[in-house]
Structures are given as C-alpha cells and as structure tokens.
Amino acid sequence: IGNPATRDEWLQRCRTLVAALADRTGAEDQVVYIQVTRGVAPRDHAMPPDAVPTVFMMVNPMRPPTAEQRHHGVACVSARDFRWERADIKSTSLLGNVLARQLSVDHGAAETILFRDGFLTEASSSNVWVVHEGALLGPPKSERLLEGIRVELLRELCEEVGIAYNLRPIPEADVRSADELLLSSATKEVLAVTRLDGEAVGH
C-alpha cells in the first residue's frame, strides 16, 4: 500500500483531530487511531493494482491504568497462542487477539498471556516482560509478536538506571516462576501483573 500522505500531512491531520476532541471534552491526553486500507475495489482476494488507499482516523481520551491497578497490579490468565504465523504485522485481522482478550474478560482478568510451543509470545494487546534476578527479560523480535511502542523506551530506561535488559526466548516455566511480570502497551503504559491463572506472581 502506498503512503497516502506526507509526514507533515499526517501530523497536521493528527493535530486537527486532537484539537477538535480537546475542544469538546477537555481531554489533554488522547489516543490517535489511524487505519489505512488498500482502498475501494470489487470483492476479490487478489490485491487491486490501482486502488486509492482509504484513510480512517479517530481520537479517544486516554484512559491510563487506575490508581488501584498501579498500586495493586492486575490479574491475567494464560492461553495457547492460536493466532496466525505473522503476528508481527499490524493489521485489522485481529480475530485471534479478540478471542484471546475475550478469554480474559470472561475470567475477570486484565489480559491473556499467550504461549506458543512452550515459549512466551505476548498478550492479546500488550507486550509481556519477565523480571528474573534483577534483569528485565522479553521475547526476541520475531514473526510471533508485534513489537509495541514501549519496547525501546523500556530498554532506554533500563540502561539509564543500570538494570540488565535482554530479549531472548522465555520458556513458560520461567514466566510462571518469575520474580515479577509486567505488561506494556500504548494505553497500559507499564503495569504489574500480580496474579497469573489465579496464582500469585513472585513473592
């Protein structure tokens, strides 16, 4: 899909949307959602060569974790990662993520942590981090997970304060025996997981 706008045009569109919502709601912190599709064409699985990309944009007030969630952490459940093999592609084909997220909702949990072939991948809409012996560990970049916007930020913060940071394959057993578990995402920021499948995390 060709980029339908220049960098300056994207920025201007975002500023216009954010300003409009701020005027209506007074919300200072907002989430901008941008969806680009290939465009309008007769229904076919083949990609139309001459379609003009369609752009949809919206903004919503940012809803960060509550004070209680920050203080006490959240509960998660786990599941087998049954999604397709290209989870690194950010697309609107999110049925696997939707089903995983619904599993956590059905159990009164904040997220569903996913495992494939015995190793941690990610959660339904978050990256997952393991704290072990003072080091922050995350799964390596691969086709099995989508790299979130907090990944590089966490690396930088670890470097600043001298915490070891390592991306490597993480067996499920290491997740369940972790000293701490964390979620990160654009809207969750960095959030502690204090229970996994009903069991307390860490000490």
Please report, for each region that a protein language model flagged, where it lies by residue.
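Conserved alpha/beta cores of soluble small-molecule-handling proteins
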Residues: 1-111, 117-119, 142, 151, ...
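Glycine- and Gly-Pro-enriched alpha-helical subdomains that act as flexible
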Residues: 115-141, 145-147
